[in-house]
Amino acid sequence: MIIANNKKAFFDYFIEEKYEAGIELKGSEVKSIKAGKVSIKEAFVRIINDEIFIMGMSVVPWEFGSVYNPEERRVRKLLLHRKEIKKIHEKVKIKGYTIVPLDVHLSKGYVKMQIAIAKGKKTYDKRESIAKKDQERNLKREFKNNNR
């Protein structure tokens, strides 16, 4: 079940490889995320000392939590196998590649994040993808009208 989606990532980047990572969270953060109070629009991923962290992810403090609720935009560790981290690190060293958060979802009761290795699109690529979507939309509309 997808809780938060980063639609802008598909528009701004060419997605190459996807990975599912766990997120190191506090108890009240889990409850808040399950309530849908999370945003990954400004989030980005960094590799620091062979560990992957998500920064800029906003988790609204749980309303029934105590005064010890964690910060809304604190740095959270992503949980991946060491082989996956090494593979991602090698790919990101290449110029033009970055790690992008795609969505936050539940998997077997655990909060997971789908991240991807991506390459940035140029403005002409973005225009091309918009034109392609418009063309597909027009084709669907024509087929729908022809079937009536």
Curated annotation (Swiss-Prot):
GO terms for cellular component: cytosol. Transmembrane segments: none annotated. Keywords: Cytoplasm, RNA-binding. One of its GO terms (biological process) is trans-translation. It is found in: Cytoplasm. InterPro entries: SmpB, SsrA-bd_prot, SsrA-bd_prot_CS. GO terms for molecular function: RNA binding. Pfam families: SmpB. Residues 128-148 are annotated as: Disordered. Disulfide bonds: none annotated. It comes from the Bacteria. Belongs to the SmpB family. Required for rescue of stalled ribosomes mediated by trans-translation. Binds to transfer-messenger RNA (tmRNA), required for stable association of tmRNA with ribosomes. tmRNA and SmpB together mimic tRNA shape, replacing the anticodon stem-loop with SmpB. tmRNA is encoded by the ssrA gene; the 2 termini fold to resemble tRNA(Ala) and it encodes a 'tag peptide', a short internal open reading frame. During trans-translation Ala-aminoacylated tmRNA acts like a tRNA, entering the A-site of stalled ribosomes, displacing the stalled mRNA. This is SsrA-binding protein.
